[in-house]
């Protein structure tokens, strides 16, 4: 059976249980994360969950009333036209399984049309590369690279640094540069004096 369901933020336990059932989920999909942005005024969080034959998917969005945008106040009726945006960070559909994606996106498009959603802006996750599975559904535009560093071991980190950065680190070590991590009042006082 193929179903597209909407999980509201008010059902946060079901929301998080659904998200945790996916291998590549990230904090950006969890209810507590999106609730903070709802409180900030970024829209109403919705989690879409699709389950079909050999395919499952989730998508978290912030639903915003376009009539409340300063450019449209007084020009559009409220609660009629909406847009979706990824919560701050990354999002987009996370898909698992080799099944046919067409029924998912047909159901999703129908839901959006039936509920007045006229656009969606997605910041896809650069590590999970979830946009790869849906180039034929979304207009995906690259906006620059993301820098990532494999932190699996100190040796791997060192090997992946550029020679210029390794030389700068050696120079700092030679000059006995100290790096502190923590909240020590004495460090803050020294910083203020230097600054």
Label each region the model flagged.
Residues 23-35, 123-124:
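A short, aromatic/hydrophobic, helix- or strand-capping loop or linear motif
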Residues 18-28, 194-195:
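Helix-loop element at the rim of GNAT/NAT acetyltransferase active sites that forms part
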Residues 64-66, 126-129, 154:
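Short, solvent-exposed loop/turn segments at secondary-structure junctions
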Residues 99-143:
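Non-catalytic accessory segments adjacent to catalytic cores
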Residues 1-10, 133-195:
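Acyltransferase donor/substrate-recognition loop-hinge adjacent to the catalytic core
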Residues 21, 114-115, 174-176:
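Structured helix-beta-strand junction loops
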Residues 4, 10, 17-20, 34-110:
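Conserved donor-binding loop and adjoining core beta-sheet/short helix segment
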